Regions:
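Beta-strand-rich binding/interaction modules
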Residues: 104-105, 117-192, 197-213
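Short acidic/polar inter-strand loop motif in beta-rich domains
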Residues: 146, 173, 214-228
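Short beta-strand elements
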Residues: 184-190, 221-232
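Long, contiguous hydrophobic alpha-helical segments, chiefly transmembrane helices and signal peptides
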Residues: 54, 111, 164-166, 210, ...
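Hydrophobic alpha-helical and helix-loop surface patches within well-folded domains
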Residues: 1-139
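Extracellular acidic, Ser/Thr/Pro-rich low-complexity tracts
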Residues: 98-100, 143, 220
Length: 232
């Protein structure tokens, strides 16, 4: 991922956030039924904004090298028109699916075949100073993944566990490129159950905010509640 290599995971947050907001806004006002990424014919907000978020999420959970292996296989198979036909989105899906570990194949299906929106938010967060100078923070996040049909109607709430980032953060910083970046004290990609998930984490410094999917890697209906101030 060229942008991640150039700006880092912190620096790419603005791009992901803008892609998310553009996709959500466009789908809200579109007069056409929404198609999945695999089936879409027109609609920049799907094949560009949504597509960029899906590809970023895939390399994030299974590694950039594995995604690149799938892309190379896809390109090698269809180079020079040797197969006598142009590649399709299904061919790209198959190439990525083939290199994806079984536990993560749902990510490829969700991204290419389904219309999925998350509802992630931080419910509460409280920290306490310990005698050894460290801080113990307990916070609860709520995660919900919903499948929609092409008319925008909810058809299924996923009750299985899903991979979602959670973290504790200090005050935002400015990097050498002048970009505002997050300052994580704790950050992990976790398997979250549908509904409330509570964590107790000890950090060296006092956290100011708790977050779920704080870098907006997932397509969340309202990403503004993904961060919450930590109370004393």
């Amino acid at each position: 991922m060229t942008m991640k290599q150039e700006y880092g995971e912190n620096g790419i947050k603005d791009f992901l956030k803008k892609s998310l907001d553009s996709y959500l806004s466009s789908r809200q006002f579109s007069f056409k039924p929404e198609r999945s990424l695999m089936d879409v014919e027109t609609g920049q907000y799907i094949w560009y904004e949504k597509g960029s978020m899906i590809m970023y999420d895939l390399q994030d959970v299974m590694g950039e090298d594995r995604v690149n292996t799938g892309l190379k296989s896809f390109l090698d198979e269809f180079k020079y028109f040797e197969k006598g036909r142009y590649a399709s989105s299904e061919d790209l899906y198959n190439a990525l699916y083939a290199v994806t570990p079984d536990s993560l194949k749902y990510k490829v299906d969700d991204g290419f075949k389904e219309i999925v929106l998350y509802e992630n938010r931080v419910m509460d967060a409280k920290t306490t100073a310990l005698d050894n100078g460290k801080w113990e923070t307990t916070f609860t996040v709520n995660s919900k993944k919903i499948y929609y049909d092409d008319t925008g109607k909810e058809k299924l709430v996923d009750e299985k566990e899903n991979l979602v980032d959670v973290g504790l953060f200090g005050e935002d910083e400015t990097n050498e490129d002048g970009i505002t970046v997050k300052n994580p004290f704790y950050f992990e990609l976790m398997w979250l159950s549908s509904g409330d998930n509570t964590f107790t984490i000890i950090t060296d410094k006092k956290p100011l905010k708790a977050g779920i999917d704080p870098y907006n890697k997932l397509i969340d209906r309202n990403s503004d509640d993904n961060l919450k101030s930590v109370e004393d």
